[in-house]
Amino acid sequence: MELAKSFEPAEIEKRWYARWESAGYFKARDKPDAPAYCIMLPPPNVTGTLHMGHAFQHTLMDALTRYHRMSGDNTLWQPGTDHAGIATQIVVERQLDAQNISRHDLGREKFLEKVWEWKAHSGSTITRQMRRLGTSPDWSRERFTMDAGLSKAVTEVFVRLYREGLIYRGKRLVNWDPVLGTAVSDLEVVSTEEDGFIWEINYPLEDGSGHLTVATTRPETLLGDTAVAVHPEDERYAHLIGKHVRLPIAERSIPVIADEYVDREFGTGVVKITPAHDFNDWQVGQRHKLMAISVLTLDAKMNELCPTEYQGLDRYDARQTLLDALQAKGLLVSAKPHKLMIPRGDRTHAVLEPMLTDQWFMSMEGLAKQGLAAVDSGELKFVPENWTTTYRQWLENIQDWCVSRQLWWGHRIPAWYDADGEFYVAHTEEEARKQAGGRELTQDNDVLDTWFSSALWPFSTLGWPEQTPELERYLPTSVLVTGFDIIFFWVARMVMMSKHLTGKVPFREVYVTGLVRDSEGQKMSKSKGNVLDPIDLIDGIAVGDLVAKRTQGLMNPKQAASIEKRTRKEFPDGIAAYGTDALRFTFASLATHGRDIKFDLQRAEGYRNFCNKLWNATRFALMNLEGHDCGQEADQPMDFSDADRWIAARLQQAIGDVHEAFAAYRFDQAARAVYEFVWDEYCDWYLELAKVQLNHGTPEQQRATRRTLATVLETTLRLAHPIIPFITEELWQKVAPLAGVHGDSIMLSAYPQVDEAQRHPGSVARMQLLKELVNACRTLRGEMNLSPAQRVPLVIEGDAAVINTLAPYMVALGKLGEVSAVTALPEADAPVALVGDMRMMLVVEIDKDAERARLAKEIARIQGEIRKAETKLANPSFVDKAPAAVVQQEQARLADFAAMLQKLEAQHARLG
């Protein structure tokens, strides 16, 4: 079948992906003696859809997977999704809420049925989208963190760590989300600076000798105070340490204590201590053996330990009621505006409460030492290396991990309680009953933090706790590709769990990617209205549909108008369909070792043009190869030209550069090496040189050029395949047979290796000279204002043998009438170009008067531009106020105009 005239990605992508997957090409293969290469997909939330960050990282993982698969490794890319406890429960609860049903109306069992139902219908969206991106994980091994095998691993770990004394139950202060009704980890807390107040309140001394003025930003927790504190070296209050004050409203007696935690400069230097509602106060309370009185319910209302008139009030209503009461008693001294950090839940944006609750914790200190030892020994490396510091700092300051969550969706904690509240940790209820002597038991209602099961992902997916062949072969895995935002949440925890439970690190390297931002460097977010959907970049989207997408479901609907305005301005014609390959090439080109990635659609357009260029180059090659002798027979004589040897040598350089780039995770450099070889060397130079050979060469030369056209293109397609899989497969199917290569798919063919015998330094040097001569000739044509249609002669003073060899190429590429070697250039007014020790001149009869007039006019124009630029740069308000980049741009313009003027004046002078 003939290759289509233009590259239409949609049909090609659909056809090839289905063929690859159904043929089982993505499956891990067990080749004896081949090295193992394994990547674990960071399991996306089952609730999720593919966002730009996913698409970026999945492109890089797939490029590595395809590269190593083609390099002959036993390659496994392990896919799967995360049950995403909180996120999934929120989604399903919202759906029920729309029907005026709460999860409590349904009960736990029915609610979980609804969640599994939802997962069955919507849970595969993200994996469908991954397929659209051309990713090639082993789908036959796809896992879900709530699968039976993974759940078994979770239970085994919990029981094992409990028996080792690393998991314990205790009453501790946790971050409590009153909307979700669960504890959340420190890492799920978003603290933002907000406007508030600081109140000063008088606490009367119990002996009636006066009062202490306390400064607080949380007056509603006053009812739970169990002390007031001053700094031990604060002379203002030294005489009061050990005395007691009367707690307003609650009318309890509480002590005045001294603790270095108190900041003498904050407020009055006296602070209230509420151990049950503040993390710092909890620590103070532990040091001074203070009682912890919790005055809030789990939904942030005042509880039964408060005076009757406050019970049942929302925390903020209680605040106002309490302030009014203090005012009435003359105890409220002042209320001053104050900026403070407010902790909110990253899912609900609710203000979190430090809450004293019974929770399960994991002791982290010993595990953290193992995590630190892994980087110290070199077992684990971060790329870029500077992320090691971030990892290390967190592990050195680690706190015990609260692993329990008050949710219904997730891995239920394998602990059972008897009627007396005694608990038994076991693999099954039957095992727990044996421990309890057959007593009636009830399972703990809590589930484990989602990150608990995620921390086991690298080895649980390989069959642990069973000692499977896959576990032996693939652990430690090769590399984890992840964002810097989950180094704490996930990376460090995987390292600690894996080291402790298997004795091995989970991966040898962690490649930390940057964050994909918009073209202006802004973080992509729904509220900013700057989110791009990778599928829209593949398929294209009309501006109206894009606006609708960006303005739907906004938390603040008032933003819709400004988002629509910005979107219509940025994308007046919507977004064009770039296809998967162009999008992947764009992502690869942006994958530098920096922290942030600015995604610019112009790049996607540039790489779509690249795909079109590669397609058209292949069409040209096929037109000159199909039905012709392509030199596949070994006994056929071939006469390779310098051009043939040069392109073969340049290909070796590109192959070497790509290998180095993949080894260093420099996907940007791999993309650049492919781009520059295909566009700048194969298309712009070699195809033009090949035309000369094919049109004017001997049969042996033509055969050699066809052989080179085919083999270099076939190798280039294999070289580019990991980055742009679809177009390379489609083209390879047509080109490979002509290069004498046979196989079912490019993705199963061997990755190109450098062939030192193809370096050809002599040919490379001669072709470099040819390029310089052609470029000099093009410059001369430009200076003389010659149209491409004017085929004029060129004379070159230099080595006649070299010139005569290169002449046919120069005629074609320089659009010349002929090229002659001369011992000396003729006397003429035409400009002369120098290339090494060669001098060259176009032989053109020119109308001197007309040319002088043209040059004079151009000189006057350039002088005007120079004056404008100089005036601008002499203006202090421009230089001082304009952005540095704008000033530099103006300086560069001035330098360019000055160089141009020099050239034009020299040409004018030569004409006399």
From Swiss-Prot:
Coiled-coil region(s): 847-911
Family note: Belongs to the class-I aminoacyl-tRNA synthetase family. ValS type 1 subfamily.
Organism of derivation: Thiobacillus denitrificans (strain ATCC 25259 / T1)
Enzyme Commission number(s): 6.1.1.9
Location(s) in or outside the cell: Cytoplasm
Source organism, top-level taxon: Bacteria
Protein name, as recorded: Valine--tRNA ligase
Quaternary structure, from the entry: Monomer.
Catalytic reactions on record: tRNA(Val) + L-valine + ATP = L-valyl-tRNA(Val) + AMP + diphosphate
HAMAP family: Val_tRNA_synth_type1 (MF_02004)
Record-listed ATP binding positions: 526
EC category: ligase
Motif ('KMSKS' region): 523-527
One function term, GO molecular function aspect: ATP binding
Gene Ontology annotations for the cellular component aspect, listed alphabetically: cytosol
NCBIfam families reported in the protein's UniProt record: PRK05729.1, valS
Entry-linked Gene3D superfamilies: HUPs (3.40.50.620), Isoleucyl-tRNA Synthetase, Domain 1 (1.10.730.10), Valyl-tRNA synthetase, C-terminal domain (1.10.287.380), Valyl/Leucyl/Isoleucyl-tRNA synthetase, editing domain (3.90.740.10)
Protein role: Catalyzes the attachment of valine to tRNA(Val). As ValRS can inadvertently accommodate and process structurally similar amino acids such as threonine, to avoid such errors, it has a 'posttransfer' editing activity that hydrolyzes mischarged Thr-tRNA(Val) in a tRNA-dependent manner.
GO annotation, biological process: valyl-tRNA aminoacylation
Gene: valS
